[in-house]
C-alpha cells in the first residue's frame, strides 16, 4: 500500500498569517478572537469573531486581479503559496497530470454574494459584476490554485459544511494511496464574517453573544453558549512517500487513516449519543492499521456549542472506551474561532505539528468544568508529551463526520 505524507503546509488564520506564527500562537495559548471590524455591529447581537489581521492581499494577487476574487479564494492562494514553497516542490519537473488539487469551502464567496445582491437590488440585476459567478462559486479556490501552479490532475472542491477541510485531506489521502495521483494540494478556505453571514448563524442560535473575548469561544466549558466565527485558510501538500523521498523532501508526518460517516438525522443538530461521529473515528483508526489505544491526542471539533461538545465527548467515549480518559483532547477553536470549511485543514496542520514536535495544544479560557464533557481537555496551557499518533475530528451541518489519523515518521 502506498503511504502518504505531508511535505508542505501553509495557513492564514486569526492567530497568524503563516504556519510558524500560527503555531507559536497556538503553543502559547494566544486568543485570536476580537471585536468585529469587517462591518458595523451596532445592529448585530454578535460582536466578536476571529478575523484575519494584517493580511496584505496585494502580496498574493495583483491589484487588477483582486476585484475578480472573493476573499476566501485569496486566502486559499496565500496558504497554497506558503505550502508549495515550504514543500520545495518544483512542479515544472513533475508530471502535472499526477498532481491535483482538493480544496474545500463550507460557504464559498458569501461576501461577493451579499455585495452583488445589494447591487442588483439598487441598480438592477443586469448590473451585477461580470465576475460575480466565478467569484462566488465554491470550487473557484481550487481552480485558481490549479491555474497558479499549472496542475492538470484531479481538481475538486469538497463541500460538507464544517467537515469540508478534513474531508478534503482524507479524499486526497485516498487519491494518492490508491495510485491516482502522486501529489495533491489540499485543504480549505473560508471568509464569511459579514453582517449577512453572522446574521444567518445568529438566527439559528448557533453563535455566542458573549462580549468578553475570554468567555466567548470556550469549548467544553459548562458556560459555553455557541461558537465564534473565524476565517482564513489552511493548505497541505500531500505526497506519496517514495516520491517525497526521491526528491529529498522534508516530511512532517504521515496521514495514516481516514473515516467519514453521516448521522442521517438532522440538518443542523448532531446525534446526542455521537454514534456516527464515533464510527468515523473507529474507521479512521482501522484504516491506519492501529488500535484505539495507540492514539495519543485528539484535536476535537470542539465548537463551544452545547450540543456539539457533549455529543463529541460521547462519541470519543464510544470510539475509545476506557482509553478516552487517557487521551489528551483539546479544541484549538478556543483560539482561532470556528473557521467553518477551513477549520479541518488548519486543525490538520496543528495536529501534524503536535506529532512532529511532541507538543499538545491547549483548550484556552477554560474555567467551569462540565460533567458532560469530562475528558482531559488540556486546559489553558500546552503540554509537552510524546505524540506518535494524533486524530483530528470535524463535524458539519447535514450530519457530516470526518476523522483523520496522523502518524509520526521517524
Task: Locate predicted features.
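ACP-dependent fatty acid/polyketide chain-elongation machinery
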Residues: 1-65, 242-254, 349-364, 407-410
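Condensing-enzyme catalytic core mediating Claisen C-C bond formation in acyl metabolism
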Residues: 3-7, 30-34, 212-288, 297
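Conserved beta-ketoacyl condensing-enzyme motif
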Residues: 6, 22, 27-160, 189-198, ...
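Active-site-proximal alpha-helical scaffold in enzymes
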Residues: 76-89, 138-142, 146-149, 154-190, ...
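Short, well-ordered amphipathic alpha-helical segments that serve as non-catalytic structural scaffolds
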Residues: 76-87, 141, 168, 239-240, ...
Amino acid at each position: 500500500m502506498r503511504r502518504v505524507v505531508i511535505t508542505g503546509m501553509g495557513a492564514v488564520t486569526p492567530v497568524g498569517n503563516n504556519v510558524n506564527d500560527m503555531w507559536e500562537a497556538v503553543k502559547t495559548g494566544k486568543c485570536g478572537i476580537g471585536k468585529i471590524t469587517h462591518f458595523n455591529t451596532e445592529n448585530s447581537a454578535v460582536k466578536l469573531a476571529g478575523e484575519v489581521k494584517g493580511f496584505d492581499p496585494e502580496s498574493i494577487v495583483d491589484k487588477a486581479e483582486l476585484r475578480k476574487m472573493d476573499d476566501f479564494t485569496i486566502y486559499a492562494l496565500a496558504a497554497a503559496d506558503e505550502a508549495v514553497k515550504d514543500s520545495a516542490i518544483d512542479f515544472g519537473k513533475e508530471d502535472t497530470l499526477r498532481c491535483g488539487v482538493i480544496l474545500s469551502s463550507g460557504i464559498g464567496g458569501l461576501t461577493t454574494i451579499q455585495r452583488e445582491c445589494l447591487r442588483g437590488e439598487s441598480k438592477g440585476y443586469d448590473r451585477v459584476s461580470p465576475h460575480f459567478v466565478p467569484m462566488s462559486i465554491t470550487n473557484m479556490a481550487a481552480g485558481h490554485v490549479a491555474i497558479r501552479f499549472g496542475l492538470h490532475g484531479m481538481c475538486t472542491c469538497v463541500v460538507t459544511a464544517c467537515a469540508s477541510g478534513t474531508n478534503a485531506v482524507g479524499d486526497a489521502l485516498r487519491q494518492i494511496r490508491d495510485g491516482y495521483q502522486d501529489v495533491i494540494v489540499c485543504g480549505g478556505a473560508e471568509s464569511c464574517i459579514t453582517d449577512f453571514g453572522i446574521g444567518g448563524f445568529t438566527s439559528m442560535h448557533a453563535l455566542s453573544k458573549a462580549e468578553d473575548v475570554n468567555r466567548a469561544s470556550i469549548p467544553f466549558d459548562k458556560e459555553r453558549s455557541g461558537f465564534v466565527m473565524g476565517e482564513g485558510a489552511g493548505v497541505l501538500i500531500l505526497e506519496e512517500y517514495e516520491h517525497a523521498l526521491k526528491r529529498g523532501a522534508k516530511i512532517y508526518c504521515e496521514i495514516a487513516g481516514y473515516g467519514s460517516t453521516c448521522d442521517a438525522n438532522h440538518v443542523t443538530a448532531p446525534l446526542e449519543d455521537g454514534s456516527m461521529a464515533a464510527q468515523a473515528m473507529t474507521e479512521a483508526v482501522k484504516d491506519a492499521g492501529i488500535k484505539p489505544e495507540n492514539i495519543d491526542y485528539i484535536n476535537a471539533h470542539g465548537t463551544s456549542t452545547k450540543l456539539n461538545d457533549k455529543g463529541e465527548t460521547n462519541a470519543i467515549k464510544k470510539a475509545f472506551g476506557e482509553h478516552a480518559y487517557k487521551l489528551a483532547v483539546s479544541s484549538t477553536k478556543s483560539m482561532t474561532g470556528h473557521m467553518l470549511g477551513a477549520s479541518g485543514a488548519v486543525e490538520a496542520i496543528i495536529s501534524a505539528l503536535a506529532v512532529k514536535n511532541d507538543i499538545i495544544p491547549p483548550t484556552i479560557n477554560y474555567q467551569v468544568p462540565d460533567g458532560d464533557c469530562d475528558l482531559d481537555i488540556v486546559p489553558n496551557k500546552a503540554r509537552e508529551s510524546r505524540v506518535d499518533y494524533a486524530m483530528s475530528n470535524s463535524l458539519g451541518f447535514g450530519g457530516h463526520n470526518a476523522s483523520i489519523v496522523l502518524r509520526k515518521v521517524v
